[in-house]
């Protein structure tokens, strides 16, 4: 039997990814051309850059797919990458604003400017590297987790060691540095992904269910508290006071249309303008200077304005199909490492689309994260494509292992007869 890896490519993951990538190029073209023309710039520059990053992502996927799985399990390599990632995040934050390589973008310090290429945002890769890192850690602790349950996850003699010792230190370091960039959106997503990975690590359901209910309850109480106090709750001495404006917009975007509520109010207008069937591709009104960041954080309202609520639902359905296919592979996986990666990547996509769309329609505060595979942004697309590359590699490995086991089973069960 031919067990060549190419025979086990999971098209139910690859095809939805390619469809979303194609829609993304079309929508980036639609949202960026008017703004580029108004600024007197090359109208095709941003869509060409996005296309280049998508082609680079396809090459990366092809390379990673061909790697043997043991290469992805190399703990020294994973540890080295995590150190480089943390140092790059710190580099972005501590360098002065005047330093050309780390000049702020929209007030945030999370970008590294590479001449001739553009900007790279390390936090976008951190979301996938956290999954990779925790999958490596938890997959080697399965016997200990089975014996000691959650006590193995939060092992330590003191409370400080339980919270910041061992595998938790790199995760906390990334969260803290990313928060003070400031980058609330990616910080929340990384934290959510880490919680998903803990839940998938093998701890008993009663612990994970209990903590999940507690966190969701606290979030609901917090959002309710925002409506009572009006959103202005972050003390001025903290480096994250910018969040107050987002909280104020969440409570009521129409009280300050010129400032804090401008984006969310115009997001509503875009969705209402689109209706069920949309105004037609390229015919959005809000992208013409009314809705800031229409090509990134708020691309989904523009999708609805141009393609309608039906078009938005179809795109979400494609994305949820992709997520479900990866989740199914993760649940069925025989290897703990494979299962953790698949559940982590599918969880990342689910959380990110919820945070993006939830912020755009006002059910949670806006956080500035991109819509997976549609928004303009090379780092975001590359980072999420890295997750898809891992998923395709692991899916092929699981399928090949299953076929090999079946082949061996039938080979050993076939009776042999001696000649009379």
Swiss-Prot record:
GO terms for cellular component: cell division site; plasma membrane. One of its GO terms (molecular function) is lipid-linked peptidoglycan transporter activity. Keywords: Cell cycle, Cell division, Cell membrane, Cell shape, Cell wall biogenesis/degradation, Glycosyltransferase, Membrane, Peptidoglycan synthesis, Transferase, Transmembrane, Transmembrane helix. InterPro entries: Cell_cycle_FtsW-rel_CS (IPR018365), FtsW/RodA (IPR001182). Its EC number is 2.4.99.28. Belongs to the SEDS family. FtsW subfamily. This is Probable peptidoglycan glycosyltransferase FtsW. It comes from Lactococcus lactis subsp. lactis (strain IL1403) (Streptococcus lactis).
């Amino acid at each position: 039997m031919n067990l060549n890896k190419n025979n086990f490519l999971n098209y139910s993951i690859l095809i939805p990814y390619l469809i979303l990538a194609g829609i993304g190029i079309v929508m980036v073209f639609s949202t960026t051309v008017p703004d580029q023309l108004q600024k007197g710039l090359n109208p095709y520059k941003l869509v060409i850059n996005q296309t280049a990053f998508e082609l680079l992502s396809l090459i990366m996927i092809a390379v990673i797919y061909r790697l043997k799985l043991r290469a992805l399990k190399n703990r020294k390599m994973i540890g080295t990458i995590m150190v480089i990632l943390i140092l790059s995040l710190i580099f972005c934050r501590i360098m002065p604003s005047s330093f050309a390589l780390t000049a702020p973008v929209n007030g945030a310090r999370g970008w590294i400017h590479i001449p001739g290429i553009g900007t790279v945002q390390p936090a976008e890769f951190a979301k996938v590297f956290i999954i990779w890192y925790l999958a490596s850690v938890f997959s080697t602790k399965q016997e200990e987790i089975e014996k000691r349950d959650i006590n193995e996850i939060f092992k330590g003699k003191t409370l400080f060691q339980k919270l910041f010792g061992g595998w938790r230190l790199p995760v906390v370091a990334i969260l803290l540095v990313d928060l003070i960039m400031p980058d609330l959106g990616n910080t929340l997503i990384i934290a959510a992904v880490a919680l998903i990975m803990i839940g998938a690590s093998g701890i008993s359901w009663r612990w994970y269910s209990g903590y999940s209910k507690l966190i969701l309850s606290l979030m609901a109480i917090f959002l309710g508290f925002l409506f009572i106090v009006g959103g202005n709750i972050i003390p001025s001495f903290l480096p994250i006071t910018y969040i107050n404006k987002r909280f104020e917009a969440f409570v009521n975007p129409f009280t300050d249309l010129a400032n804090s509520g401008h984006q969310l109010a115009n997001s509503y207008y875009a969705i209402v303008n689109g209706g069920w069937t949309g105004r037609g591709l390229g015919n959005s009104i809000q992208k013409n200077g009314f809705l800031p960041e229409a090509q990134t954080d708020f691309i989904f309202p523009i999708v609805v304005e141009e393609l309608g609520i039906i078009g938005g639902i179809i795109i979400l359905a494609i994305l949820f199909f992709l997520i479900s296919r990866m989740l199914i592979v993760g649940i069925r996986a025989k290897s703990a490492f494979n299962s953790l990666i698949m559940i982590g990547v599918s969880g990342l996509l689910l959380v990110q689309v919820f945070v993006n769309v939830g912020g755009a329609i006002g059910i949670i505060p806006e956080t500035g994260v991109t819509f997976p595979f549609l928004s303009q942004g090379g780092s975001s697309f590359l980072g999420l494509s890295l997750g898809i590359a891992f998923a395709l590699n692991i899916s092929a490995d699981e399928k090949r292992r299953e076929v090999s086991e079946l082949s061996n089973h039938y080979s050993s069960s076939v009776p042999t007869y001696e000649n009379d």
